[in-house]
Amino acid sequence: MHEIEASERELQSAVAGRDMEALERLLGQEFTLTTGRPGHEVRGRAEYLEVTATRYVIEEFRFDELEVIELGPGAAVVRSRYVQRGAMDGVDRSQPFLMTDVWAHRPAGWQLVTRHVSPLASSGP
C-alpha cells in the first residue's frame, strides 16, 4: 500500500474513532475542509477538530475508490469515492461522497492540508 494511501486510511479511521491525537498529527496547521453545505461551506482546522470530537459520528465507512497522484517528493493529491454510515448533530449523513485531498510531506510525515467533499445521492454503505 502506498504511504499516502495508508495515511488517508489512518486519517479516516481517526475521524471515525475520534482519535484526536492522530488527527492533531495528520492535519496540517493550515487545514481546511470545503463542503459547500450552506452556512458551513469551509471549516478551518480548529472547527473541524471540534466538530469531529463532539458532533460527528461515523458508524461505518469504506473507500470504494482511492487514487494517489504524486506531484513530486513533497506533495500529493488523493481522489476518492468514500461511503459512510453516520450522522452529525443527529442528522443522518449516510451517503457516498467524492473527496479530493491535498497532502504535504513535512518533517513529521505526511499531513493533510485541504479536503474538498462533494456529497452524492444517498445509497447507504
Task: Please identify what each model-predicted range represents.
Residues 2-5, 17-72, 80, 91-95:
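A solvent-exposed, acidic/Ser-Thr-rich amphipathic alpha-helical stretch
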Residues 12-13:
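Amphipathic alpha-helical repeat scaffolds
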Residues 68-76, 103-109:
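A short, structured loop/turn motif at beta-sheet edges
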Residues 81-82, 116:
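Short, well-ordered beta-to-alpha junction loops that form the rim of enzyme active sites
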Residues 82-84, 103:
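Hydrophobic beta-strand positions in extracellular immunoglobulin-like domains
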Residues 84-85, 119:
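Short, surface-exposed beta-strand-loop junctions and turns on beta-sheet-rich folds
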Residues 96-125:
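Short beta-strand edge/turn micro-motifs at domain boundaries
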